[in-house]
From Swiss-Prot:
UniProt main location, coarse: cytoplasm
Family named by the database record: Belongs to the GGGP/HepGP synthase family. Group II subfamily.
Cofactor: Mg(2+)
Listed EC numbers: 2.5.1.41
Record-linked NCBIfam families: GGGP, GGGP-family, PRK04169.1-2
Keywords attached to this entry: Cytoplasm, Lipid biosynthesis, Lipid metabolism, Magnesium, Metal-binding, Phospholipid biosynthesis, Phospholipid metabolism, Transferase
Annotated residues for binding of sn-glycerol 1-phosphate: Y171, L172, E173, A174, G175, S176, G177, G203, G204, G225, T226
Taxonomic lineage: Archaea, Methanobacteriati, Methanobacteriota, Stenosarchaea group, Methanomicrobia
Protein name: Geranylgeranylglyceryl phosphate synthase
């Protein structure tokens, strides 16, 4: 499966993509697979697997394997470092945290991880990763110089730099469990400069209203993760979010 082409096809046909983020450190591999299956029943298009801390090694491998046993949508690694790679996934967001002060998150982890991606033939999807206030755990771990919420022009120039460096996707991240999502003004400003390049938005998207607001502002893909760990009916919550963004 060519994952990037698959996601593009969904955008062409349905307008937007919904991605479910599962952190292997938050539950057992078996429970992760149950969440993934419930999300797929709700209409999610792919499963992202990763987290800021603890998502590596045997736990990561077992989580990917269990999820793939349950669902047939793409599994995409969302690594916090080079340790967050698994040869069992379909693809990886091969990303650079452009607004990190730590070169490790800008390029060193990528250099260390590239051989495994090459050898295992996981599909790399190039991505500029940008962390916006409040940033959450990922902002702290990644030593990010957070982009202020009220400075959409800063996010836009970072995104433009990523585009000119050849990155296909840009991800605006407010941080897992953020109290509110990226504001529409910033999403719109970034999408304007990206043009046909794809914009992912995540963090703080907890209901249909927030999802629709982000999608309408210009997000091509919406990510939800934390809220799915908190609700009893994952299928219903995902269906609510998906129906808000798809045409």
């Amino acid at each position: 499966m060519q994952v990037e082409a698959h996601l593009q096809k969904i955008i062409d046909q349905e307008g937007k993509v919904h991605l479910t983020l599962i952190d292997p450190a938050s539950q057992t591999p078996e429970r992760a697979a149950e969440i993934a299956l419930a999300a797929v029943k709700g209409g999610t298009d792919a499963i992202m697997i990763g987290g800021s801390t603890g998502a590596s090694g045997t736990l990561l491998d077992e989580t990917v394997i269990k999820i793939k046993e349950k669902v047939d949508v793409p599994t995409i690694l969302f690594p916090g470092s080079s340790a967050g790679l698994s040869r069992y996934a379909d693809a990886v967001f091969f990303m650079s945290l452009l607004n990190s002060r730590d070169l490790g998150y800008v390029i060193t982890n990528q250099v260390m991880g590239a051989p495994l991606v090459y050898q295992s033939q996981i599909e790399p999807i190039s991505m500029a990763y940008l962390i916006v206030e409040p940033g959450g755990t990922v902002g702290w771990v990644g030593d990010a110089k957070l982009i202020p919420r009220k400075k959409p022009e800063l996010a836009a120039v970072y995104a433009l730099a990523g585009k000119y460096l050849g990155m296909h996707y840009t991800y605006l991240e407010a941080g897992s469990g953020a109290d509110k999502p990226i504001n529409p003004e910033m999403i719109g400003a970034v999408k304007k400069v990206l043009g046909e390049n794809k914009l992912i938005v995540g963090g703080g998207i907890r209901d249909a209203e927030a999802a629709k607001l982000c999608a309408s502002a210009g997000a091509d893909m919406i990510v939800t993760g934390t809220v799915l760990e908190e609700v009893r009916d994952v299928t219903a919550k995902v269906a609510e979010l998906v129906s808000a963004i798809k045409r």
